[in-house]
């Protein structure tokens, strides 16, 4: 099964954190590296799924927000990944977002579903969520817990609706925030994991930071997480997410 993975570029190099490539391979899939000059329609026809990886901030200016704390942005990269995301989504391919990937998907969802802006809010900055800068912790170490739905995150068959607590790493400062009384949000968007970390007491009474969400009924299925499972080697997460598509690929090959 071929999983697309967009890569970044400098003036002289294309590059991607090798942890993403190893993550896809360890789950039993074939990574397909996609550079920004690729023909999106052609390349997506050869894919079985897409991972939108972490990276630099999504440029808030494009979405009508002031840039108050994003020191590195790349509007061309943003546009390429937006186009790639929608091409896969409209082809009903499963899309898995990681960190920046979650942020880009959430912003595109809010544009397409303006009614969701009443209970979802994109923050251009939140504190206490970048362990590399604030705590000098390596990427593969966990730094805080999130509450999560095991059913939505891992496809657990357990009937219990009680959230589980899982430790995660954290390397971001842009964030999606939801009103507590409103989650899960709508029929398409479901909050999968959340935390109050980074919120002051008054904010935490009414809101939570969205650490993971799923979207259905908007093209291919979508799951996005704010942490970095590729560094934690959580292969079960993407194996479960892409398993349905893998069955289709195998069936079509018979």
Where are the predicted features?
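Active-site loop->helix "elbow" adjoining a glycine-rich segment at hydrolase catalytic centers
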Residues: 100-102
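N-terminal beta1-alpha1 cap of cysteine-dependent amidohydrolase-like domains
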Residues: 1-98, 107, 111-173, 177-218, ...
């Amino acid at each position: 099964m071929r999983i697309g993975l967009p890569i970044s570029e400098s003036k002289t190099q294309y590059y991607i954190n090798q942890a993403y490539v190893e993550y896809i391979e360890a789950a039993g899939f074939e990574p397909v590296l996609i550079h920004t000059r690729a023909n999106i329609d052609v390349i997506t026809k050869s894919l079985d799924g897409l991972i939108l990886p972490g990276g630099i901030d999504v440029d808030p200016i494009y979405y009508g927000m002031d840039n108050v704390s994003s020191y590195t942005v790349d509007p061309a990269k943003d546009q390429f990944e937006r186009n790639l995301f929608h091409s896969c989504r409209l082809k009903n391919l499963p899309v898995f977002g990681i960190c920046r990937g979650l942020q880009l998907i959430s912003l595109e969802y809010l544009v397409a579903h303006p009614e969701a802006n009443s209970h979802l809010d994109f923050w251009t900055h939140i504190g206490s969520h970048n362990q590399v800068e604030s705590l000098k912790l390596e990427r593969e170490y966990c730094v805080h817990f999130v509450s999560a739905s095991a059913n939505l995150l891992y496809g657990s068959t357990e009937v219990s609706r009680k959230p589980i607590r899982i430790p995660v790493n954290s390397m971001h400062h842009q964030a999606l925030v939801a009103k507590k009384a409103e989650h899960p949000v709508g029929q398409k968007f479901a909050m999968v994991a959340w935390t109050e970390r980074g919120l002051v007491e008054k904010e935490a009474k009414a809101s939570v930071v969205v650490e993971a969400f799923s979207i259905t009924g908007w093209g291919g299925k979508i799951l996005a997480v704010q942490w970095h499972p590729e560094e934690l080697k959580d292969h079960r997460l993407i194996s479960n997410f892409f398993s349905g598509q893998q069955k289709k690929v195998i069936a079509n090959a018979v």
